[in-house]
């Protein structure tokens, strides 16, 4: 054998024995920059066979899927009899990984032995490597989490981003996903070398990965975009922080706190831009990989404090009893709240009803771009505020949006349109007024929002919700969830009013999108005076006035039922025809 052949054999042997070396060669062949320190550390963790059941979490854009696909090829090169199952939230994502694995095999000449041979499986979604023995299961198979998982056995299961916004936004969706991933136990070969590797970024505070860690014995290894910023964040990471980052941080925590972990990939300026784009909560989830956010003090607004009910469009009970027990939980509406934050209807309500008093349409205008023009229709009665409709429109205050808003005002018979004066000189009012008049005759009032938005929203909504004075029409919740879409028209729960409500904090920039929530808060601020009513006391006063008035009338025999409205309260009584001014006698 020639000297060059010897050198080549030594290099190949080194690559086969060292995944990091293999990664450097592959990155060079793909014309990618040299692997960064976090990518190298990630490769070392993947190659460590002692990690049998673990969750690899790394900030968005680090290339964890690419590195894992490279690891699959390297593993098959070392042991062609391995069976590897790749599962993703969608079949397209799983297939993309499978295609990339095949491309790696085709790209590197020294891997030519792994190319499928005649008679072996050789498709995008299922293929064998050349030296593999005939087997019921292919060497590599890709499948979506809702696809045909059964019928395959695997030495290594790689779950790559099985949790995405669309399958984790509601409690029902999260429970379904949890049921699906429990199938992995039946697919994994019962061997000491078998492994399950999750790759992912938390999508919600109730992330699947937290459940796996708490209830299924998985360990989590995290590469956040920044070193721990606070003592609390450092406590959360604890031993979850990647070993390399943990050693670096512990050596000099004061200097490293809040600095980029991989400045070659994302420097401070890059990460500041992403924090503005995602909002503080979104950045903490997707770049800091910290789902440990769901405490009542941080998130002051909870769905369980509101009353959800099917509402009459003309009148409502004068008083409700709120009791958040199991029998009052509503389970057939999409719930985007935090874990344990259920939707509840009322426990009981008054037999007396009254017609709604104030009716307003509140609008939070926006410019063009990612923001919506948020709106809410609010009614009041006896100290309660009723949310009858809410939503958002694109295109700022285009003619189409203004026409739709004017039609909403007519549909709900509002007495006043309230709008935020965030365009200076009442510009929105001047533009909207003539269009509104074409459809509906009502007053228009401008309201100026003051102070930091997040503080104002929380301070306005928290007392209303904690005293259970916000009543939400049930259809609002369903329509809000279905209409939550991003600028490209794709469903995005971050545009939902109730997602915004349950994720806002008093920190500046807490939400990337808050238009629908801001409209609701503006409306409740406008209606603040009506909230100061004591509903039970007012109901009693109205009834007392009715009785006092009728006690002054002469009594007669009663044979007929009559109905009247007094002080906004519907009253049913019996009276003789022709004695409308007389009191009843039994």
Swiss-Prot record:
Statement: the UniProt record of this protein carries the keyword Ligase = no
Q: Name one Pfam family in it.
A: Terminase-T7_RNaseH-like
Where are the annotated segments for Nuclease activity?
344-429
Q: Which residues bind Mg(2+) 2?
A: 364, 420
* The protein's Enzyme Commission number: 3.6.4.-, 3.1.21.-
What biological process terms from GO does the record include? chromosome organization; viral DNA genome packaging
Q: Where does Mg(2+) 1 bind?
A: 364, 518
State any single GO MF term: metal ion binding
**What biological function has been recorded for the protein in this entry?**
The terminase large subunit acts as an ATP driven molecular motor necessary for viral DNA translocation into empty capsids and as an endonuclease that cuts the viral genome from the concetamer to initiate and to end a packaging reaction. The terminase lies at a unique vertex of the procapsid and is composed of two subunits, a small terminase subunit involved in viral DNA recognition (packaging sequence), and a large terminase subunit possessing endonucleolytic and ATPase activities. Both terminase subunits heterooligomerize and are docked on the portal protein to form the packaging machine.
Describe its assembly: Homopentamer. Interacts with the terminase small subunit; the active complex is probably heterooligomeric. Interacts with the portal protein.
What is the name listed in the Swiss-Prot or TrEMBL entry for this protein? Terminase, large subunit
